[in-house]
Amino acid sequence: MSSDDEGREEYLFKIVVIGDSAVGKSNLLSRYARNEFSANSKATIGVEFQTQSMEIEGKEVKAQIWDTAGQERFRAVTSAYYRGAVGALVVYDITRRTTFESVGRWLDELKIHSDTTVARMLVGNKCDLENIRAVSVEEGKALAEEEGLFFVETSALDSTNVKTAFEMVILDIYNNVSRKQLNSDTYKDELTVNRVSLVKDDNSASKQSSGFSCCSST
């Protein structure tokens, strides 16, 4: 290892992906981390995670992304996994209005179990199913503005805005951490577990940014 590598700063951020069951959380994560999609994916049992690496301002940033089960009977178990999270994607299915109506409950749970400075992204998934849309883009934007969230619609099926959604959250966390100087050894130790690092395409965020809708009160 070179001296440059040894002296290189490293950040490790925990991000949770939350929302009702079957909104596509697991497929969003697998599309982002492994560029995979499963049309017959089963409901997540418990919690799974992937780690993705990217470079920001010459620093290595690793996002440890946790996929929490949406089924009600698992919520008490997964609540412990909010601990240490500095980012969250709150996902609903644009074809199922009930999942959009549940967003407020998920945001309340996030507020209870995490810090108020968590970077939050509202994600309307399955935008490839425009012909059976039940929640308009305008409704998603309005809720995001009301709650002070970033907002984007995605499709795990065709990859639309998937990288953009995750990387906007990661960048916002990085900016928050840089400002508050939270990159302490204690903070990093809290989030360190066995993981697999995956390297992103450096140009991917810029390529997809044109399709991104951002709504924030800050």
From Swiss-Prot:
Gene3D superfamilies per the UniProt record, alphabetical: P-loop containing nucleotide triphosphate hydrolases
Similarity section: Belongs to the small GTPase superfamily. Rab family.
Lipidation (S-geranylgeranyl cysteine): C214, C215
Location within or outside the cell: Cell membrane
Extent of motif Effector region: 41-49
MF terms (GO), sorted A to Z: GTP binding; GTPase activity
Predominant subcellular localization, coarse grouping: membrane
CDD domains per the UniProt record, alphabetical: Rab11_like
An annotated GO cellular component: plasma membrane
Residues noted as binding GTP in the record, renumbered to the chain: 19-26, 67-71, 125-128, 155-156
Modified residues (Cysteine methyl ester): C215
Coiled-coil spans in chain: none
Annotated function: Intracellular vesicle trafficking and protein transport.
Entry protein name: Ras-related protein RABA5e
Pro-piece positions: 216-218
GO BP term (any one): protein transport
Keywords tagged on the record: Cell membrane, GTP-binding, Lipoprotein, Membrane, Methylation, Nucleotide-binding, Prenylation, Protein transport, Transport
Organism, as annotated: Arabidopsis thaliana (Mouse-ear cress)
Membrane topology: Lipid-anchor
InterPro entries, per the entry: P-loop_NTPase (IPR027417), Rab_GTPases_membrane_traffic (IPR050209), Small_GTP-bd (IPR005225), Small_GTPase (IPR001806)
